[in-house]
Regions:
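Extended substrate/RNA-proximal surfaces in nucleic-acid metabolism proteins
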Residues: 49-197, 258-263
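Short, basic/aromatic-enriched C-terminal tail that caps enzymatic domains
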Residues: 246-267
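A short acidic, helix-capping loop that chelates divalent metal ions and anchors anionic groups
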Residues: 84, 243-245
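An N-terminally biased module of ancient metal coordination in phosphate/nucleic-acid-related enzymes
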Residues: 1-70, 153-156, 160, 173-178, ...
Length: 267
């Protein structure tokens, strides 16, 4: 049985609507998924209808700052209706909109024609808006051939149209997830540039062992989980963005036996 516990939808920086992603997961033969959109629980607001045959673990991926680097914290089994997570999602959404508008202004100052109304319209669906949405607009207007090129040329961190954003501390992210009844796991450690040891001292409940950027380190992170008595998770980090691996749901997935304790956490 295959699962994917790290996926993104249009509610944050993915391409597809939650219903579309869920159906793609079913079509790919996945039995369990978790939609872990960045800093929002909009996929779980009750307006989306998912296939009955698919188990979905409520999740989120929170953005934190440690040592000037973006450290992501995955939350599983959160209560999407808990006031703490609802409040965070609302506040983050407003900050994200402000940031998106600032990036639009930068693009306009650079000579691009961008419609602010399109950005605001995206917010009507209850999710967040960010660089991928702006990049998609730039591609649609013919400025660049694909989303990756927009990031490489314009929206990369420190790029001509980039605007920094406020992030919680790692501790704050873990506390928020716990308040909402969930468990907090360190996301994709293979992507972290600084030394891991100080980060591993935070009160995580687990670690994302299986991730495309962790290749070559699966055994190392598995041993770490055993040493710390941590839960193990894994997923594709699927966004549906062209030229970003994996390009299809189910290409990178995890055997359920490798994440059995997490799957049975609430049984």
């Amino acid at each position: 049985m295959n699962v994917d516990l790290h996926m993104h939808t249009h509610c944050s920086d993915g391409v597809y609507e939650p219903e579309q992603l869920a159906q793609m997961a079913v079509d790919a033969g996945l039995a369990v998924i978790s939609i872990t959109d960045h800093d929002t629980i909009a996929a779980y607001d009750g307006s989306h209808h998912f296939p009955a045959s698919l188990r979905i673990i409520p999740g989120i991926e929170l953005s934190s700052d440690y040592g000037g680097e973006d450290i992501h914290v995955l939350g599983y089994y959160i209560d999407p209706h808990h006031e703490a997570i609802q409040s965070y999602s609302r506040q983050f959404r407003q900050r994200r909109l402000k940031r998106a508008m600032q990036m639009v202004d930068k693009c306009i100052s650079l000579g691009y024609v961008v419609d602010k109304n399109q950005i605001e319209a995206l917010l009507q669906k209850g999710g967040t808006v960010g660089r991928p949405h702006l990049a998609k607009m730039m591609v649609e207007r013919g400025y660049y051939p694909d989303i990756k090129t927009v990031f490489d040329k314009l929206l990369y961190r420190g790029g001509p149209a980039y605007i920094p954003y406020h992030r919680y501390t790692v501790d704050q992210c873990i506390d928020l997830i716990h308040q909402a009844g969930g468990i907090a796991l360190l996301a994709h450690p293979g992507m972290i540039k600084q030394k891991l040891d100080p980060i591993l001292q935070f009160q995580f409940d687990g670690i994302e062992v299986y991730h495309p950027e962790n290749r070559g380190h699966f055994d190392e992170y598995s041993r770490l989980a055993v040493q710390k008595h941590w839960l193990v998770s894994g997923g594709s980090d699927y966004h549906g963005v062209p030229r970003r691996y994996p390009e299809q749901v189910g290409v990178f997935c995890v055997d359920a036996d490798n994440v059995r304790e997490l799957l049975q956490y609430r049984d």
